[in-house]
Amino acid sequence: MNKVLIFGCGGHAVSCFEVLKCEGHEIAGFVKKSDEAIEKNIIKFNSSPEIQIFSETDDLMKISSKAVIGIGQIKTCEPRKNLFKKLSLDGFDLINVISSQANLSKYTSLGKGVFIFKEAIINANVSIGNNCIINTGSIIEHDCNISNDCHVSVGSIINGNV
């Protein structure tokens, strides 16, 4: 299994790190924008020799071609949307990550770069687009269509046929 790069150095990246590790992924490191502040918890992870912090200007494809977007979506989806487009064009494999503590119907379809956190429940005939966050404890009932670049926030409930 190739190591995974986490693009982002904030709180959401910390949450992504934990799920990736719990699901057995090896982490290549975190990638930060040149002007991005680094979450203090990431500095703690960086004290481990196998976890590094890279700059977006590094030759990242030499490190790994697998990636997740570790920036959240608090105010707008534009930063995630733009990063997804850039990484896709650069040839990165934006992997889907599904916590083993989530409950996902086998009749669910997923786009690329989907991240499903712990205790999420996704029922039958749900379609989830590219670059989506299905956050901790959220529920998506039957026959829902979650478009590209959506964030179903912590504890959200989306009833059927939405």
Across the structure, where does each feature detected by a protein language model lie?
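Hydrophobic, well-ordered beta-alpha structural blocks that scaffold small-molecule cofactor pockets
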Residues: 1-48, 54-61
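Short, glycine/serine-rich, charged loops/turns that create anion-binding
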Residues: 11, 35, 74-75, 121
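Short alpha-helical
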Residues: 11-12, 75-78, 109, 128
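Glycine-rich, phosphate-binding/catalytic loops in enzymes
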Residues: 23, 84-87, 132, 150
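Phosphate-bearing ligand-interacting subdomains
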Residues: 39-99, 103
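Structural signal for interior beta-strand "rungs" in well-ordered beta-sheet cores
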Residues: 96-162
